[in-house]
């Protein structure tokens, strides 16, 4: 009945507010002087961007204060460079970017400082295998800033284009300009994602295969992780990963969050991850990045 629904809605609101207060209390308990924090890394989807695909005003103020304090900020994402640049331009950020979870790294001047991919033949072998399995999925292949997909009209590809504000090219692996494929993206029916992931890991153990949402699988060259990317950037800047802060919300962020001295999982992360990773911040719609940075005295 309407009265029951109103009661349920009120209960949910109270529960949500209580959860947020708990996270704020936990963060305040960690408050200390953090002169040893030298660099900040952040994932994009589900972390830096809120549910409207925007950076919240408070989080943006925190990022600008990082710039003012000359604390490096690094965007680290499974997205392509062209999927990250619109965010950088829109909000006037100055930062290095890590694309494809570490397969391609560019500095603040957008010079390539690291790149590694699989060959076109290797990528084609994976795709041939998935075709034989008749998995319910769409795929895209990425090389530097080229994104190829066999059917641009697939609604799953169209949705991905809208989210990342980048355009795919109709084509196949043979159409890729460079013989260096940094990532294969599989957009799966959520009910199939875990099955496809397990099957691919069993068939191709030499690659990094990781779930970045309940519908997305990312396949990169072996040894390509956000954690390894953090190590590379920290080494170039002569910074210990223990002096870094990182933010993420999904399975492809785990190694990074475990590596750094202060790794924060957003409270909108999957429940299984929240049980695995002990340090949390508020969710992407409640200034999770800004809350954690404030608690650590950075801003």
Residue ranges and their predicted role:
Residues 9-33:
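Short, Lys/Arg-enriched N-terminal segments with co-localized hydrophobic residues
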Residues 36-51:
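Asp-based phosphoryl-transfer active-site loop
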Residues 52-156:
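Active-site phosphate-binding/coordination module
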Residues 66, 77, 101, 184, ...:
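Residue-level signal for inorganic ion chemistry
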Residues 70-74, 93-95, 182-183, 242-244, ...:
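Short active-site oxyanion
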Residues 129, 133-247, 251-259, 268:
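Conserved acidic, metal-coordinating active-site core of Asp-based
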Residues 259, 264-299:
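Asp-based, Mg2+/Mn2+-dependent phosphohydrolase catalytic module
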